[in-house]
Structures are given as structure tokens and as C-alpha cells.
Amino acid sequence: MFVNLNKSLIAQRFAKARQSYVENAIAQKKISHHLCHLMQAYCPLHLSRIFEIGCGSGNLTQELFVSFQIQRAYLNDLYDEVKQHFLDEQPIEWCIGDIESLSLPEHLNAIVSSSAIQWVQNLPQLLGRCHHALNDQGWLCLSTFGSDNFKEIKQLTGQGLSYWSVQDWQVHLQASGFELMKIEQQQLKMQFDSPRAILKHLKATGVTGTVATTQPHWNKQSLAQFYHDYCQFQTDDGHYELTYHPIYIIARRTS
């Protein structure tokens, strides 16, 4: 079974986890750093108007401010509290709300997003809107996740998000009028001291929308069973693995 997304619940969980996220989102920081590195290899230095989908605590945003010449950054997220992570003097304009129902800024040089668009339910429609919002030759630079993301959790609970493959992205980007400049994927194996620490990590990063960590069937017995079953993912040195499966995309508007 795959999770039916409740956007208001997702917003509540990320808002609740906003402080612990900064400390615990180690994988997300690595992913945003690598996305910025890829952008530096392909995009021009001057990106005067950018729009970021799901800016969160600003991991990607701050890297972009350091690496590119940005005159105006339009930042989106589901909840208002993200503003506390940013400086007042930064050239930011806020677009708070669900990206699937918000109007996008126009005449953009780049649209970026790191570890956020997996929550979007109608990706083809969003790609079409991004194409319309970008200038000719504008850049679409994303990191999202593939099917092996949290595969351990999915195997044990049967719950998780439905993800596009690299091939899906290639097809849909071309259909939406983008030239794919670079696409690559990784598998990041995070290690924890216990299965309980993994559930705490997911809660601390606000991503419990992908697992049933707040569902009624999590009782003492079912948690004990989950901890027991997770032992199959124990490494030789006694740690427990959780897989992140990021996909990186650098594309350019062509028509």
C-alpha cells in the first residue's frame, strides 16, 4: 500500500520537526550540496530570478546564494515557520502554500528543488507549469527520490511513496519541453544504532508521512515486532541501515 498524501498533515509534521530537522537532516544536506555542485557544472553564474520549491530550512538556498549571483529568490514551502531560517536582508520573496495550487512567479532563470517534489501528486502538470514560468533556456534543477528510498521501511510495513524512475523522468521532461542535461542517481546508506533510532530520525526530519509512525496499529507489540524484523538490515559492525535513493536532474527549457 502506498501513502495517500494529506498535505495539511505533511505541513504539520514538517512544522513540528523544524528545529530537529536542522540537526538531523544529514542526508538531505548531502543531497542539496551535490545538487548545487551539479548546478555549478551546468548553469551560468548569473541566475537573477530563481524559484525554489520546498525550501525547508534553507540547505539548498544558502548554497545557491554563495555559489550564484541571485537578485531575487522566490521561496516556497507549505508552512510559514520556515521563514525563521532566513535572514531579513536576503533578497527573498515568500510563496507559502501548496505548490500544486499556487501561482508561480514568471520570467524565471531557474526553478530548483531539493528533497521536496516527491510530495507532489501531479508531477506532469507541475512540469508544464514550470516550463511556462521559465524564460527561454531557463533551468530546472531538482533532486528527488527513486524507488529504493526507505526500502527497508517499505519492505517491513508495505507503506511508502510512489516514485518516478530515471526513465520516467526522461520521458516526462522531454514531453514537457525540457532538454535533459544531466540525470544521475545515488544510494546513500545511513547507519543507526538501533531500529528505534531510525524511527526517531524519520520523526525528527518530518518525513513520517512515508511510514505509519503515527498510525493506531503502532502499539507496544507491533513496535517490538518492527524492531525485531529490522534486524535483517543489521550490518556486520552492528549498525542498522536506512537507504536514501536520490535522483538528480539538470534540465533546460527548450521550447
From Swiss-Prot:
Pathway this chain belongs to: Cofactor biosynthesis; biotin biosynthesis
One Pfam assignment: Methyltransf_23
InterPro entries per record: BioC, Malonyl-ACP_OMT, SAM-dependent_MTases_sf
Disulfide topology: none
Superkingdom of the organism of origin: Bacteria
Molecular functions (GO terms): carboxyl-O-methyltransferase activity; malonyl-CoA methyltransferase activity
Reaction it catalyzes: malonyl-[ACP] + S-adenosyl-L-methionine = malonyl-[ACP] methyl ester + S-adenosyl-L-homocysteine
Enzyme nomenclature, EC number: 2.1.1.197
Keyword Transferase: yes
Classification via NCBIfam families: BioC
Family classification: Belongs to the methyltransferase superfamily.
Function: Converts the free carboxyl group of a malonyl-thioester to its methyl ester by transfer of a methyl group from S-adenosyl-L-methionine (SAM). It allows to synthesize pimeloyl-ACP via the fatty acid synthetic pathway.
Protein name (Swiss-Prot/TrEMBL): Malonyl-[acyl-carrier protein] O-methyltransferase
Organism: Acinetobacter baylyi (strain ATCC 33305 / BD413 / ADP1)
Phylogenetic lineage: Bacteria, Pseudomonadati, Pseudomonadota, Gammaproteobacteria, Moraxellales
